[in-house]
Amino acid sequence: VPPAQGVEIRVVDLAVADLRDLLADADAVVHLASGVTAGDVGENTGHDRLAVVERLLAAAGDVGVGHLVVRSSAMVYGAWPDNPVPLTEDAPVRPCPDFLFAVHRARLEEMAASWAAGDPARALTVLRPAVTVAEERPGGLASVVGAATSIRSHEGEPLGQFLHSDDLADAAVCAVAARYHGPLNVAPDGWIGVDVMAELGGPGPRLRLPGSLAALVGRVLFRVGLSPAPPGVFPYTVHPWVVSNDRLCELGWRPSHSNEEAYVAGHEPGVLDRLD
């Protein structure tokens, strides 16, 4: 797909490129790179990717970038029994400690906040999107969450939010236009329950197990390669972590896809979806 008129696309490696030269004269920088993926495990995973973020922040500071937009995740709120439904941006950042993806995003937010604090003229927008999908491309996080929710626990019923990538792009544009300073949840209106997700995903029973057994089955399936969902994601399939989009909507943003539409667009049935 050719770029829009006036748009120049340059493919660079942020780990080695001269970022000061690339960012010179930029008014705003939007950093949407994924970093650690939802299926990553291991305590040393992601250090090199955070080093890349450090390079980007240093270069942005050196050349005088005034506005930075970074993509975090709604998962930084963590999935906890006492979470309000929905969560607003005023909720504390407390990711589930065993899920590296969420912990990494929280660390990214800390680094970006330190950059913003270095100069009162700097603005920082932190986008906290729900599970994001594209047409026929569920993405790594959607695949992980989908696999994890196929094993249902008696401890709770998961609530889901699914964001179309086009709506995430519109949110980034909105944040730049408003030069917004602070966190912004990015999600469709409302949320859907596990029964709706099962109906939209097609026929096929799911596993429903006691909490401890569900977690054990999830660990075994991940270890033998039958599931992309690491054990640390399990709390996100039990406790609520859906978010409110009110603050972003106040800036003029509106989702063009519902949860249901985004879920169907990005859903790929997995092994457990077809389990007899």
Which role fits each region the language model picked out?
Residues 10-55, 59-63:
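NAD(P)H-binding glycine-rich loop region in Rossmannoid oxidoreductase-like domains
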Residues 54-100:
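Conserved Rossmann-fold NAD(P)-dependent oxidoreductase catalytic core, especially the SDR/UDP-sugar
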Residues 81-131:
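Catalytic helix-loop patch of NAD(P)-dependent Rossmann-fold dehydrogenases
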Residues 116-161, 165:
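NAD(P)-dependent short-chain dehydrogenase/reductase
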Residues 159, 169-230, 265-267, 273-276:
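Mid/C-terminal beta-alpha module of Rossmann-like enzyme folds, strongest
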Residues 165, 194-196, 223-255:
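Conserved C-terminal active-site "lid" loop/helix of NAD(P)H-dependent oxidoreductases
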Residues 249-250, 254-276:
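Amphipathic terminal alpha-helices
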